[in-house]
Amino acid sequence: MSRDNMYYDAVVIGSGFGGSISALRLSEKGQKVLVLERGKKYSPGDFPRDVRQTDNLLWRYPKKRKSLGLYELNFFSGLGTVTASGLGGGSLIYANVHIRPDHKVFEDPRWPAPFNRSYLDPYYDKVATKFDVKPVPPEWDLPKRNKFRAAAELNQHTYFDPDEAASWLKPSRPGQSICLRCAECEFGCNHGAKNTLDFNYISDAQKNGAVFQINSLVSHIAPDPKNGYVVYYENTETGEKRSVHSKRVVLSAGTLGTNRILFNSRDKYKTLPNLSKQLGKGYSGNGDFLGGIESSKTELKPWDGPDVTTVINYFPKGFQFTMAAPTFNQPVMTVLASLGISKPNWLLRMIGPLFWKSLEWILPLVFKKGLLSKPLSPGLPGAGDPTYMTNLFAIGRDNANGKIVRRGKNIDVKWKYSKENKTLIQNMTTSMQQVGDAYGGQFGPLATFLLFNRIISVHSLGGCILASNPDKGVVSETGEVFGYKNLFIADGSTIPSSIGFHPVMTISAVAEHTAASICAGL
């Protein structure tokens, strides 16, 4: 075990939204900050496009030690998840969408005081300014946007073009370029048009002296008998185990990463034995639900524009969700169109769940063999021309009743999601069918949901939730871990309920609040 000789005022674990925000705000106060990021640095042009190169595509460390890629896929007992790995965290692969949620979201009793929409608005403002967010230019004629709006109007639902963190018509920062409308936002922007964290919060923190150290996977945290904490981590390239000391620690490893580290610290290494018994509880997938439409009567050109242009808001009609129509570049949409609209028979639906966890090795094998590198020929039932296809993505207020538990060397998520959120799923499916009808096309939910009866979430929340006391959550309203002074959490794991809107704006606003609380105590 090697020990870093440097002593820091703060060690931040993770460089996603919460970590980068924490690093900047602490560095602005003259604090000596080290950020430990497990992934690598990606510059424009570095993001993988060949899915056959699975070690570059997927994060599977330490099971596969050379697989240090961009996407981490998990097939937990209760649902599947997709998260990012790299300097900038989820900002590298999200759809750039920044939405301030409906005030009703904060009426959920799980949100402690002082959190509500008006309290968070100044923090939302900070985030919006730093990311230079703005809607897709209204003058762009985008067939996919036009049709999605028309479907909302036909079904008498409210829609809007959300703020997005992208350089539409002029670069937001030096080193960036303008959007080429290539629909590759969620694959990592190889043109530098996304206003990812490395172009704003991270670069500004670095100017203040903050150090961002990549290839550093944290295993656990322990109190330092002298002062502060010791953070233990491993170099993912060499396997060398190291430690670093600091007065305070900010955990921002993402919902799954932060829960992993705390479960390790409490249950494996026994270094944080007094963590709240609420650890792992209150997990939410933010109601993520995917579907698709084939054979629209109108040409959609789904690869023209950013991934998301418009959001339909179902909240005003009393429903607890929103919907977007994310689409991708032409090669990917062509493959997706060839998969058709799945309608597995009763036998496949019955045995499908038995094979759910096998996807952990089946899917990488499918990628490596190039089976999804080109469209299926002939296409599966319901396959159509990709020009007339779109995806649908609903985000909703699930019951946030998932439970993260320690399983072997990893974690698992226990949750009877489909049973507990049956009404939400039914309402989403009905609304998607209505959109499909408005398109004059054929709608179907994501095949994995029909086969395995499990959703796949790209918006993991909770497990270390904000609360007024340790009987209700893991961190106080300031983001400080109950029972551990100067140990803070700033990421999606602290969010105490589902949001029903794209969550990055709220995760970031709460992180700004936490950073302000930390700085106030310096």
Which residues does each predicted region cover?
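A glycine-rich dinucleotide-binding beta-alpha-beta segment and adjacent secondary-structure elements
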Residues: 68, 181-185, 220-224, 388-396, ...
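C-terminal catalytic lobe of FAD-dependent flavoproteins
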Residues: 344-435
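Conserved redox-cofactor binding core of oxidoreductases
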Residues: 115-218, 453-456
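Redox-cofactor-proximal catalytic regions of oxidoreductases
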Residues: 55-138
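N-terminal Rossmann-like FAD-binding beta1-loop-alpha1 element of flavoenzymes
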Residues: 10-35
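Extreme N-terminal leader/targeting segments of oxidoreductases
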Residues: 1-10, 28-29, 520-522
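Mid-to-C-terminal "cap/lid" subdomains and adjacent gly/pro-rich loops that border
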Residues: 247-255, 259-380
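Glycine-rich loop(s) and the adjacent beta-strand/alpha-helix scaffold that form part
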Residues: 28, 39-50, 207, 220-224, ...
